[in-house]
């Protein structure tokens, strides 16, 4: 998910030479910042940032957001947490969505980098329509199939339909590791376990959607549910920090 398609085959070749199993890790249905003309930009409180649907090279005044359809679902007042709360934005003007952009205001200063995850305020009860796989993910899976890669870690899986879609795209030739890292996944946990080959608990991303003090308890619930269905689980990220 953090590599380019051009780099992917190179990394696959390295893993084969080292005789290490390789896993295709998808971006999944996560909102991310686009490319920037610099490694990062610093924004102060009350700065304005234009958020664009189309792919642009961002700068100190405007950035692109993907998937593009998410901008059409945002409303004025919505809060966006960028890169583990490094930067916090509030949507303040959506009147230009027909022109391909909306306006946000910085409410907590910080740095913005390229390809960084964005979380919409979990207190917002609306459900957002997000693709299970990005176009880049689909191409990465094709490269994996061509190179006989047998594992795909599917990020931000939200329900069993998403698992089945990944299985369809991989032609049923890859074992699916469903990553549990959002509220929807917790609500649909049993059906996700049923359709998956393995689970992965992403404690870091999950802590952006539920209070961090609930992570150990939630982790235990997921492990118990998976054990009940004889499904193996990876426990990943932010282990040493707690």
Please report, for each region that a protein language model flagged, where it lies by residue.
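Non-catalytic helical/linker scaffolds that mediate oligomerization, partner binding
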Residues: 1-242
């Amino acid at each position: 998910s953090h590599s380019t398609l051009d780099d992917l085959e190179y990394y696959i070749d390295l893993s084969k030479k080292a005789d290490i199993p390789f896993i295709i890790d998808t971006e999944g249905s996560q909102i991310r910042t686009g490319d920037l003309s610099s490694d990062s930009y610093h924004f102060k409180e009350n700065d304005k940032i234009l958020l664009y649907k189309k792919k642009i090279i961002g700068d100190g005044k405007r950035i692109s957001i993907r998937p593009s359809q998410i901008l059409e679902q945002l409303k004025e007042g919505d809060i966006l947490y960028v890169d583990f709360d490094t930067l916090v934005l509030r949507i303040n003007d959506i009147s230009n969505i027909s022109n391909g952009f909306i306006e946000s205001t910085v409410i907590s200063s910080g740095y913005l980098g390229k390809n960084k995850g964005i979380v919409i305020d979990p207190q917002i009860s609306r459900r957002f329509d997000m693709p299970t796989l990005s176009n880049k993910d689909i191409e990465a899976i094709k490269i994996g199939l061509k190179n006989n890669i047998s594992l795909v870690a599917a990020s931000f899986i939200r329900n069993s339909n998403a698992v089945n879609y990944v299985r369809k795209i991989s032609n049923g030739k890859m074992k699916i590791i469903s990553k549990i890292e959002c509220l929807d996944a917790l609500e649909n946990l049993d059906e996700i376990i049923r359709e998956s080959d393995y689970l992965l608990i992403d404690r870091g991303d999950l802590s952006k959607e539920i209070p961090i003090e609930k992570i150990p308890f939630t982790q235990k619930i997921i492990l118990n549910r998976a054990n009940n269905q004889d499904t193996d689980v990876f426990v990943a990220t932010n282990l040493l920090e707690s």
